[in-house]
Amino acid sequence: ELDSNTILVSIMWVNNIIGTIEPINDVINIVKDYPRCKLHVDLVQGFSKIKPNFSFKDIDLFTISMHKIEGLKGCGILGFKENINLSNHLIGSSQQFGINPGTMDLAHAVCAAKTIRLALEDNQFDYVKSLNNYLRNKLSKIKDIYINSPENCASPYILNISIPKFNAETIMHALEQKEIYVAVGSAC
């Protein structure tokens, strides 16, 4: 519950476990009623894959992780409006807007820019949606397989299922033998 003391709301745009797409516009409209409150949106699972259902000008901060769009692991972006005052987590020089002392890693910055450009050019949404629909159709016909990802308002890039009678690791390794790669959990 928000009140006049709330200074930050942070929300995932796309849930990394079941793929739910959060109604960011609704959150924006709620946060607007609290002038001290800023809105951070975690774009990691949806950036470049799904068309935003909100305007970037209406959010105060956002984060992107490059490895989720085929970029370098350990490289990310924190975007924020000019009126946002962030405090540094390390003491040092005033480089990087005074947030992080030291020289910016130019190689990572260039790779991030290139990764974003390529990711935005190579949108596979329709193809991935067709694969998701195909999998849902086939899996729904198999007894004791439960689809946990919602059909509507969900990313087609994530399809979470449960098979209670089998060990997840065993299924994962059996599928690997068929060159089908799945995850049995989240490292996030």
Language model features: what each stretch is:
Residues E1-C188:
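Pyridoxal 5′-phosphate
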